[in-house]
Amino acid sequence: MLARLPAPLHRLVLKVAHSLRLAWWSVRRPELHGCNVIAADPQGRVLLVRHSYQSPEKWMLPGGGMARGERAEDAACRELLEEAGCRLVEAKCFAVEVVGLAGASNHIHLVSGVTAEEPRPDCREILAAEFFAIDALPDAITQTARARIAWWAAQNPAQNRAS
């Protein structure tokens, strides 16, 4: 349904919905489960995205909420396809972080994998999606994304070397 809206109106709806969701979480304080995806291309670069509704000037890892009973790897594959138009293979959950988010307890499942596809963001939810070399991440990246990539890279030195 939202896809029928003009892109600027769609982005406005996403911003309002995100604000309402954060307000609701501050009241309800739910336990949430989501994923962040570290998708590397064959050259070892990682995919980052810029959301239209949350800090659009910042680069972040792709990801999103997990449905009840959904495996982290399946959620990561779904989110990467939705946000960047890329298929993730060799998906593996390598850690779970619990962080506070607007009063909610947010369990972030960190999933890594490989994609050989060029990103195709919809320019609605996702304004941009690009691959970056680990040693040349953009200045405008969130600290959380930078830390998660560094942690993953330290554990997977062979996987993130340029060919």
Positions of predicted regions on the chain:
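Charged phosphate-binding loop/patch that engages nucleotide di/tri-phosphates or the phosphate backbone
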Residues: 150-163
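Active-site-adjacent beta-strand/loop module that shapes the phosphate/pyrophosphate-binding cleft
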Residues: 97-120, 130, 148
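Acidic, metal-coordinating catalytic segment for phosphate/diphosphate chemistry
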Residues: 1-36
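A short coil-to-beta-strand element that immediately follows conserved catalytic motifs
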Residues: 87-95
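Conserved hydrophobic "DFG−1" position in protein kinase catalytic cores
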Residues: 39-40, 48, 113, 131
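Conserved Nudix-box catalytic region and its N-terminal flanking loop in Nudix hydrolases
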Residues: 41, 45-82
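NUDIX/MutT-family hydrolases
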Residues: 121-153
